[in-house]
Amino acid sequence: MDIKKVAVLGAGAVGSYVIWGLSARRDIELGVVADGPRGERLKKDGCAINGKIYRPAVWTPQEAHDADLLIVCLKYGALPGALDSIKAVTGPHTTIMSLMNGVDSEDIIASAVGGEHLLYSLIKVASHKEADGFHFDPETTVGIIFGEKEPPCDSPRVKAVEALFGGTELHFRATDCIQEEMWSKFRLNVCNNLPQAILGAGVGCYRDSVHMKAISDGLRRELEAIAAAKGIDMQKVDAVSGKGCAVKPSARYSTLQDLDAGRHTEIDMFSGALIRMGKELGIPTPYNEFAYHMIKALEEKNDGKFDYTGPNQEMTWAR
């Protein structure tokens, strides 16, 4: 199996890492899937990554049809609206890798195109947007981790992806424990993203505050209880996958970046999913319930819901 046509859906923080790496391959077709005004903007402006403009092809979903590999790099909230595009891209032999956060995007995609197309995967990259585009440190980036959900783990498509990435500066590795790896990253996201987003401080807060560490640990305990109930043994991968990318103490992860920019977050994918799973399994999730409602309230604040200015304010009472 050779991968010669690669389509990337989503050219944001995660997609930028993929585009940066695969643009070095001159022996493949590389395109970003986009149409309408967004597609025109990408054709005109390209993708600004680490101070350089990259110009992959821009394909409509129909033009990208039957790509050998489709890499999905969307925000969680955008996935339901993108399923028609994913179906249009997917041909009989298309492999799909979802580099989205969380642990259920593969299930959502599989419901639209069939689970046989999915090669389970994740990415660890500390990417952020500045005025001149997206930035990340290639050297400290952990990169892309992928593997088959079921044996054989050294399948032809795993070997094909290894060969594709091997000719680039992308950091990557294949694993026999992809579900445990995904839950390990999910744990990092929940425990590191959410408390700092509520506080509005850099990640150094976990090192410097016993209170922030206590909140992070509470979220961790709930997640690990749910994972154990689902038969996910994250101890299998703790030695190789228990840490994220090295960052400065001032670093702000994706949830706080979203709030800083006035965007809605992926809290439904993080605590929202854990609350749902906890209810299904009979496992209490008070830390995640608090984080969920606090971040939802911060979204409402960004939306202007609590803008109590003006002369004609209706009186209210605490209750």
Specify the residue positions occupied by each region the protein language model found.
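NAD(P)+-binding Rossmann beta1-loop-alpha1 motif at the extreme N-terminus of oxidoreductases
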Residues: 1-55
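NAD(P)-dependent Rossmann-like dehydrogenase/reductase catalytic/cofactor-binding core
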Residues: 2, 217-319
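A structural signal for isolated positions on well-ordered beta-strands in alpha/beta enzyme cores
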Residues: 7, 29-31, 97, 119, ...
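Short, well-ordered alpha-helices that flank and scaffold nucleotide-derived cofactor binding pockets
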Residues: 20-24, 84-88, 111, 272, ...
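Glycine-rich beta-alpha junction loops
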Residues: 37, 101-103, 122-127, 150, ...
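Short, charged/polar "capping" segments at the starts of alpha-helices
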Residues: 38-43, 106-107, 154
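Rossmann-like NAD(P)(H) cofactor-binding subdomain of soluble oxidoreductases
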Residues: 51-135
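Internal alpha-helical scaffold of NAD(P)-dependent oxidoreductase catalytic cores
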Residues: 88-89, 112-117, 132-235
